[in-house]
């Protein structure tokens, strides 16, 4: 949420500049710098990755330290508060603990509260929904961040296209040509939830566009 807020402030700042509203733009520029400084101070862990949430008192608790896929979105906005070194630390953690070929886990597989499978009673499904279940839609943001902060974006993009090709099997199960809402947190990752989820498909298409563009032109996005 903080990353989206920072991005929104920066976008409005740039729009004001285009309209010649320099004084208003300067105020938003000062605000954006304040947001960035505060965010990095409060949300950065000692290892350079990000706390997931902070309680009202601002002091990290057990929930803050859980590794979840939300931190990937801080890397993919047009305006980001995260510098390259920190971004690479975040990507390494996401790749190690959350990444699967069909999406990102909602909780690290090393967390004691990790649920590897989504199923059972309504209560059991609810307990797994955000506690390890793989969500497909964050995959687009993850791949964009991989390209953006790569030292070799062209090769990274080609690798991503190869990884995306592995999703052909997912497109052929359930509802043909669609990607499900969620998948089990452990392999084999069975599709669960909604069998044709619009945001899963949309992010898959975005990932293809990002990777094909970077592979063709060899630039970060």
Model-derived features: positions:
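TPR repeat positional signature
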Residues: 2, 9, 139, 143-146, ...
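C-terminal substrate/ligand-recognition segments
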Residues: 113-152, 156, 205-209
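Short, flexible/disordered secondary-structure transition segments
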Residues: 153, 178, 215-219
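Generic structural signal for hydrophobic core residues of well-folded globular domains
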Residues: 78-82, 94, 146-150, 208-211
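Terminal, non-catalytic domain-edge segments
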Residues: 201-221
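Short acidic-aromatic active-site loops that bind/stabilize oxyanions
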Residues: 1-5, 131-132
